[in-house]
Regions:
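Active-site glycine-rich loop that binds ribose-phosphate moieties when present
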Residues: 110-112, 141-154, 158-179, 212-217
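A C-terminal functional module that forms or caps the active site or interfaces directly
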Residues: 227-295
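N- or domain-start disorder-to-order transition segments that initiate the globular core
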Residues: 1-24
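Anionic-ligand binding region
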Residues: 198-224
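A glycine- and small-aliphatic-rich helix-loop capping segment at beta-alpha/alpha-beta transitions
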Residues: 42-48, 80-85, 135-154, 177
Length: 312
């Protein structure tokens, strides 16, 4: 994908990110749906700016991705981040399906994991840090509600560092789906699949790797041998910020039941569930969410540095 020639009217890369690409510095992509739909203002904008600073301190270059005025942007200004934070749910949530239409209409759009992967690949960025990937929703055997993130992971050559799939999802079916499409699910220093707010779940990852170097080597071999598609690196939330399983699961079960009662479906379901869980936990889940993003940004920076070292 990085070989495609994209018009600068469609894709703009910030000077900081351009410099990183030109001089072979490690870059880390960041999504923008977490800003507009994942957290309330002003925590959303503050967190996004602090995550960028965290990546810089690790010796990598952050590249927050969004659509601004119909332009796919790789690297946002603070004003653009704050715009997305203030506008919140008024900003269109953009996955693969929506991308051409939001760009063509000249609108603002917040990128999901799937569309962030697409734009990162267009720019030549191989590592992406987020909170949690989308997955198979609970009740998908009736609704077929499966996040487009999973198909993107099957097809697009970007490594996604996350705290597992969001725990509002069906984690068992999500792992099965990833296995079917040949997506490696790597546990960073763990064999148990992290469950976003919790460090463990009843499900296992496909392989445990204990260092950024091992992960970077696997990325290089995978893509050099023509095995297209992404890798998921599941990084457990730090222990001091993890939530008790009983309380978070009770909040999730209640939120899922309320979503069903209110007919919340499709791309609105995840923002609804995360916001409702935050309310039900008295804001504790939001605090955990913020901390796990920082943790993932640090690991993603280390992986990006190692991959860049191998790539030369």
């Amino acid at each position: 994908m990085s070989e495609l020639k994209i018009s600068p009217e469609l894709l703009q890369i910030s000077p900081e990110v351009q410099d990183a690409l030109k001089n072979k510095k490690p870059g880390v992509a960041l999504e923008s749906t977490i800003i507009s739909h994942g957290m309330p203002f002003p925590q959303n904008a503050q967190t996004a700016i602090e995550v960028e600073e965290t990546i810089r301190k690790q010796g990598a270059v952050p590249a927050t991705i969004a659509i601004i005025g119909g332009v796919m942007k790789v690297g946002l200004s603070k004003d653009e981040i704050e715009l997305l934070g203030r506008e919140g749910h008024n900003v269109t949530k953009v996955s693969r399906r929506d991308l051409p239409f939001v760009v063509a209409a000249g609108k603002n759009g917040a990128t999901t994991v799937a569309s962030t992967m697409i734009i990162a690949a267009l720019a030549g960025i191989k590592v992406f840090a987020t909170g949690g990937i989308g997955g198979v929703h609970r009740g998908a055997e009736h609704t077929f509600d499966i996040s487009a993130d999973l198909q993107e992971l099957a097809n697009t050559n970007v490594t996604v560092v996350c705290a597992g799939a969001k725990s509002i999802l069906d984690l068992g079916l999500t792992t099965e789906y990833l296995e079917t499409f040949g997506v490696p699910l790597i546990g960073y220093q763990t064999k148990a699949l992290p469950a976003f707010f919790c460090r463990t779940s009843p499900f296992e990852v496909s392989i445990r790797l204990d260092s950024a170097t091992e992960i970077a080597r696997a990325m290089a071999v995978k893509w050099q041998t023509g095995l297209n598609g992404g890798l998921v690196v599941a990084n457990p939330i730090p222990e001091q910020f993890a939530m008790p399983e009983e309380s978070i699961n009770a909040a999730i079960d209640q939120a899922v039941a309320e979503a069903e009662e209110q007919g919340v479906i499709g791309k609105e379901s995840t923002p609804f569930l995360l916001a409702r869980v935050a309310e039900l936990t008295g804001g504790d889940s939001l605090k955990s969410n913020i901390q796990l993003v920082f943790n993932n940004a640090i690991l993603a920076s280390e992986i990006a540095k190692e991959y860049q070292r191998l790539a030369g």
